[in-house]
Amino acid sequence: MRQESGRSMIEMIGVLAIMAIITAGAYALISMAMNTEKRNRVGDDVTAIVSGVKQLLGEYDDFSGINNSTIFGAISMSNKNPYGGNYELAVDTTNPRQFIVSINGLSKTVCEGLKTKAWIDSVGYNVSNHKESGATANCVEGNNNVVSITYGD
C-alpha cells in the first residue's frame, strides 16, 4: 500500500474554522476600538464646543445670544457628530446663564453610553459633587436619541 502525502479534508476544515474564529475576534476588537474612538471624539468635540462658547460669549451676562451657525463657524468646527447626527446649542430657558449642548442622532446603545459618561464641568456633574454624569437623555430603540449636557453658572 502506498502512503500519500497531503492534507485531508478534516485538517483543511479545522484550519478554516480556526481562521474564522480569529477573523471574528479581530472584527470584534476593531469594532470595539472604533466605538471607543467615536466616544472619545464626542468627548473632545463637546469640550471644544464648550470652550468656544465660553470664549465667545463669556464676557456677556448670559448665553441668550447663542446661535448654532455662528458658534460652529467661529470655532471652525462642523456640527456633525461621529454617529451621523448633529451637535446643537441652546440657551437654558430656565437659566440664561447656562447653555445646553445636545448630541442627537444616537442609537439606544450609544445614547446609554454617553448618558453615563462623566461630563466634567457640566452643571449636573458639579452639582452632584461628581456623583452623576451631568447628562440627561431618554434612550429608546432607534437612532433618534438625544443626550443633553448643561454648562454654565
Q: Locations of the language-model features?
A:
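Sequence-pattern detector for short linear motifs
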Residues: 10, 41-44
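Extracytoplasmic/periplasmic, Sec-exported soluble proteins
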Residues: 38-41, 106
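Periplasmic/extracellular, small/polar-rich flexible segments of pilin-like filament-forming proteins
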Residues: 55-153
